[in-house]
Amino acid sequence: MSKRTFKIVILPGDGIGPEVVAEATRVLEVVSASSSDVEIKLETHDFGGCSIDKHGEPLTAATLEACKLADAILLGAIGGPKWGVNSKVRPEQALLALRKALGLYANIRPANFASDSLLAYSPLKPSVARGVDIIVIRELIGGAYFGERKELGARAQEDAAWDTMIYSVPEVQRITRSRRQVASPDPPLPVHSIDKANVLASSRLWRKVATETIQNEFPQLKLDHHLVDSASMLIVANPKKLNGVILTENLFGDILSDESSVIPGSLGLLPSASLAARPLWPNTAHRRSSPRRVYEPIHGSAPDIAGQGIANPIGTILSAAMLCGTRSVWRSPAKAIEAAVEGARRQGDRREGLRTADLGGSSKTKDIGHKVVEILKATL
């Protein structure tokens, strides 16, 4: 029987993106080689700043079409000072356009410690950071980032600029229902909905709809509400109060997910996934049995260390594990990747040489990738 093909589009991006994605790609190649019934087909495309330099735009029609036809997408990182906020064309525009085109409405990002040995690298005191286990679910394609806007100097009122934050009942229902994408222990994780309902009309709608959706569809879940300014203080003062699932809109989620992600001490350690509800294209060429998803590490492009080979690839490798974990045929390889990462981490606890510079070590990006691949090959 011939192997089924699983197409993954690789978007290395900018800065350290190509370096960390290369190690995750090696891991996916090992998974493909070990499978008797599924073959992973990898296809690389320019995205972000490198696409601007080569093609004059951050997301070409060819790259977008490839992403639409893919089963999953693995992204490195985009951006850098070369394409600053005053540039007419910016790498971040590619990410927003991709999210909109693929219907990527929910971003899931964890913030936790793989080991207490990492507590020393947290910016918070160990007594405050120990035991933090937060998952941020952020709405991705609504709110101020996608509302009507006017730039300074454009049209009437040339001395003013604005952005509009709009949410509808279906949009809030959809992101609230995405809570089911997070595996729950027994008892289930509590949900902390974050808004600014004391000021914003869109937040009052958010709070009302989130409450009704949880009560009507997930009555077993414990739900509470926090104002965004209060939640941002809790994340640095007593983050364990927000253990569980943080559910919030686009702008607040952008800020809070970044704030919570630094608690574990290194942005290079954690993965994330952006989810679509269903395939969005009616024509046969774009049909898939499951919605597209984008997987990426939580860190940025880190241009200050790009090209030095010292970036931590663990977050990207774990993003590849998340990618595999969404397919029933690859649940076992996904767990094997996670176990290989844990094995490499344990060796790092004993030997500083298996830690990258962000964790006080001296190992290279490729050293970490090689060790993970070595352990994975022995397991699969």
Swiss-Prot record:
NAD(+) binds at residues 80-92, 300-312. Pfam families: Iso_dh. Keywords: Amino-acid biosynthesis, Branched-chain amino acid biosynthesis, Cytoplasm, Leucine biosynthesis, Magnesium, Manganese, Metal-binding, NAD, Oxidoreductase. Gene3D superfamilies: Isopropylmalate Dehydrogenase. Its cofactor is Mg(2+); Mn(2+). Disulfide bonds: none annotated. One of its GO terms (molecular function) is 3-isopropylmalate dehydrogenase activity. Pathway: Amino-acid biosynthesis; L-leucine biosynthesis; L-leucine from 3-methyl-2-oxobutanoate: step 3/4. One of its GO terms (cellular component) is cytosol. The record marks 145, 196 as: Important for catalysis. Its EC number is 1.1.1.85. Mg(2+) binds at residues 229, 254, 258. The keyword Magnesium applies. GO terms for biological process: L-leucine biosynthetic process. Its main location: cytoplasm. Substrate binds at residues 99, 109, 138, 229. It is found in: Cytoplasm. It catalyses: (2R,3S)-3-isopropylmalate + NAD(+) = 4-methyl-2-oxopentanoate + CO2 + NADH. InterPro entries: IsoCit/isopropylmalate_DH_CS (IPR019818), IsoPropMal-DH-like_dom (IPR024084), Isopropylmalate_DH (IPR004429). Binds 1 Mg(2+) or Mn(2+) ion per subunit. Belongs to the isocitrate and isopropylmalate dehydrogenases family. Catalyzes the oxidation of 3-carboxy-2-hydroxy-4-methylpentanoate (3-isopropylmalate) to 3-carboxy-4-methyl-2-oxopentanoate. The product decarboxylates to 4-methyl-2 oxopentanoate. Homodimer. This is 3-isopropylmalate dehydrogenase.
